[in-house]
Amino acid sequence: VAQKTVRWCTISNQEANKCSSFRENMSKAVKNGPLVSCVKKSSYLDCIKAIRDKEADAVTLDAGLVFEAGLAPYNLKPVVAEFYGQKDNPQTHYYAVAVVKKGSNFQWNQLQGKRSCHTGLGRSAGWIIPMGLLYDQLPEPRKPIEKAVASFFSSSCVPCADPVNFPKLCQQCAGKGAEKCACSNHEPYFGYAGAFNCLKEDAGDVAFVKHSTVLENLPDKADRDQYELLCRDNTRRPVDDYENCYLAQVPSHAVVARSVDGQEDSIWELLNQAQEHFGRDKSPDFQLFSSSHGKDLLFKDSANGFLKIPSKMDSSLYLGYQYVTALRNLREEISPDSSKNECKKVRWCAIGHEETQKCDAWSINSGGKIECVSAENTEDCIAKIVKGEADAMSLDGGYIYIAGKCGLVPVLAENYKTEGENCVNTPEKGYLAVAVVKKSSGPDLNWNNLKGKKSCHTAVDRTAGWNIPMGLLYNKINSCKFDQFFGEGCAPGSQRNSSLCALCIGSERAPGRECLANNHERYYGYTGAFRCLVEKGDVAFVKDQVVQQNTDGKNKDDWAKDLKQMDFELLCQNGAREPVDNAENCHLARAPNHAVVARDDKVTCVAEELLKQQAQFGRHVTDCSSSFCMFKSNTKDLLFRDDTQCLARVGKTTYESYLGADYITAVANLRKCSTSKLLEACTFHSAKNPRVETTT
């Protein structure tokens, strides 16, 4: 096999020199990994174009350029991130913060007329983030942005600004003569330390820096206590509490590649071997993370290593919603759609063809208050909401867990039992997850001997169909090999070649859609999993009402029209079997109701609009043939569960408190078995996931 070669793009003679010694040292050190070759261009933008045009394969970019590279026509994606800090707790981002002196009584929404200190024009923490987030408050016209900022603050020090055209942006700077406001250390208030000194020496009221700046400049805690952070929810917190009080997370520098045919595996293999041989303290011959010919060549000198970025992560998931919003606001041609407080419409995310049809009907009936965005599967929809391409959707608890890890929050819960006036103010305790079998199956089929049986699941990662039964099973067998435990099954969303796709039948109209986690697979969802039991399986993992909803003439489809409720039974955890209507005493676990999720900056808007929509198209509408009904679809649970009585307010909540500790534990056990690509991407920047964006 010919060795793969990764073509690295360089932007200066110094980088080209370091690259050629990288190339020589790698070919000596590594016998059969990928090789590196060097391509020279004159700027990052030229490198981005060269990678798109397949003249080069990789280059390291800062977060702002990762954003540019991800846009059309380049469409590059980040594939490897630099990390800073210790190996056992690698940091792949820093926090941009607003530092103020203790006792200066103003909040984030009262910055107008204050004096400001910035690291430099166009820099992430010092300019892009604070100005992008304050964009809505800036006076019109907002172009050029420097002019708007100059009239927003009373005076500033923004190194690199033009002192002739925007004298107020340089007024507070401390450089002498031509060096005042310079774009380098000749201006004493330049960079992180400079902007902090501008605040410290009382040339400004607020400094826009990164979370470590105060720690680095004031190692003594008593000195740090003289300062505070401004939080976006208009409170203040101590400077050490930056994880709960920051403006945005700025991800570290990343290596970008083409999204299609981008060599990402070779790039990772190359860099992973390179860090083994030439990383921190490895070899005197060549060092990846230091630059004898200059500073930050090819990689940042402060990096301590590389991490592979999950495949599902594109530039906007990597950069995060707050940072992308700030960048978008500041790009001249993209101004924000509407200011934060306006609520013109809710963009609903629909999965697959059937949901999209129902959503389109809803959109027309709502007079455009609901708009539809569609995706192929649930995870792609969640990703669209995270990125701000959609606003809301209703999810099963298993997906609420994933959405929560991605920073979304529950807004309204589906209620299934509560009817009438009070429904909207009383969220329920949850529904029951059960295991259903045919009564005709022998008595030896019970909860304790399911091995080798044929199983039917609503979908992988869903609550009643997967997380609860597989979580319980995992505790018993201590293994993730569920496909070897059951003989065959249909668990939509599994790997196509898995035995858990063997029973799936796909779509009537479009072959090749077997085992997809959407309505193209006829065995998908509650009704689908029950149909799988009826036609092929031994056990179905569903919710407690499914049998009642599809038997005794309630479902008119050919496969269901003659079914009787009495012909099915439930499996209890103690090994017994019970009639279907005794779920209260014979279930696997109580599952949290499905709920609508949104980004936290959209919570109020989504809740208000949906409560209006349900007042118009909710359960009280009797004739669904002539008017639109939110909670009706042909026994398919499209957009919402069909047995939803109303959407109920849940108050300000988090995904953890909504799902409850027991359920989180079940899912956390299964995390070891999880194949969710989105979950990998959303938890990449931090194992402990400090994405508590407080925007109200």
UniProtKB/Swiss-Prot annotation:
Pfam families: Transferrin (PF00405). Expressed by the liver and secreted in plasma. Its main location: secreted. One of its GO terms (cellular component) is plasma membrane. Residues 6-332, 346-672 form the Transferrin-like domain. Hydrogencarbonate 1 binds at T119, R123, A125, G126. Glycans are attached at N25, N497. The keyword Disulfide bond applies. One of its GO terms (biological process) is antibacterial humoral response. Gene3D superfamilies: Periplasmic binding protein-like II. The modification Dimethylated arginine is found at R23. One of its GO terms (molecular function) is ferric iron binding. InterPro entries: Serotransferrin_mammal, Transferrin, Transferrin-like_dom, Transferrin_Fe_BS. The keyword Protein biosynthesis does not apply. Disulfide bonds join C9-C47, C19-C38, C117-C198, C157-C173, C160-C181, C170-C183, C231-C245, C343-C605, C349-C381, C359-C372, C406-C682, C423-C646, C456-C532, C480-C673, C490-C504, C501-C515, C572-C586, C624-C629. Hydrogencarbonate 2 binds at T458, R462, A464, G465. SMART domains: TR_FER. Keywords: Disulfide bond, Glycoprotein, Ion transport, Iron, Iron transport, Metal-binding, Methylation, Phosphoprotein, Repeat, Secreted, Transport. Fe(3+) 1 binds at D62, Y94, Y192, H253. Coiled coil: none annotated. Monomer. Part of a complex composed of SLC40A1/ferroportin, TF/transferrin and HEPH/hephaestin that transfers iron from cells to transferrin. Belongs to the transferrin family. This is Serotransferrin. The gene is TF.
